[in-house]
């Protein structure tokens, strides 16, 4: 499958974000560091929810590394694996690879235990991934498709999918 320019650019952003040590390859330790940094910024260290987030991030890495055939993916290998396992499989790819991470993030953000993300919880999320909190309200309004005042896991997975497909400009996994 040949990726559209926006899709390719978004995956390249993801590669740069996840190459945490800047060595030109994405490794399991990069995903561990990313998960641990998010957990720390959300103040969730030592919780069962933090363990789930770490496991989800490492599960996502493992799927991509298996598709790439390498535990250290260079840019080309990462782009090919992400296209094959996520973009190329459409909703099924996002459900399989991305949804566990979104569910784990919601598990940490969801302070009131309703299984969804409120506007206040969204502010915490944006701050944790290094995005300007001022855009959280605008992003929330755009993503709240059912106008419930809360974001479901489905709405968030769809938003990540739409970002990577170039349908929105809200980088929920960071930039």
Task: Describe the residue ranges of each PLM region.
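The feature marks the first
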Residues: 2-48
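Amphipathic regulatory helices of Ca2+-sensor modules
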Residues: 27-45, 72-89, 116-130, 152-166
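Short acidic, glycine/proline-enriched loop segments that cap or flank alpha-helices
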Residues: 90-94, 110-113, 127, 131, ...
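Short, charged, intrinsically disordered terminal tails
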Residues: 167-175
């Amino acid at each position: 499958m040949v990726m559209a320019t926006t899709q390719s650019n978004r995956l390249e952003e993801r590669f740069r974000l996840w190459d945490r040590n800047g060595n030109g390859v994405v490794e399991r330790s990069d995903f561990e560091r990313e998960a641990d940094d998010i957990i720390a910024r959300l103040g969730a260290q030592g919780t069962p929810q933090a363990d789930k987030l770490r496991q989800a991030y490492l599960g996502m890495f493992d799927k991509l590394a298996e598709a790439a055939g390498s535990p250290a993916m260079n840019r080309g290998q990462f782009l090919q694996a992400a296209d094959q396992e996520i973009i190329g499989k459409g909703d099924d790819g996002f459900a399989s690879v991305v949804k566990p991470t979104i569910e784990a993030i919601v598990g940490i953000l969801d302070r009131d235990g309703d299984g969804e993300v409120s506007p206040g919880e969204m502010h915490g999320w944006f701050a944790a991934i290094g995005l300007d909190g001022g855009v959280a309200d605008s992003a929330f309004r755009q993503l709240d498709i059912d106008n419930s005042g809360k974001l479901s896991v489905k709405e968030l997975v769809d938003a990540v999918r739409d970002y990577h497909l170039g349908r929105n400009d809200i980088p929920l996994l960071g930039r």
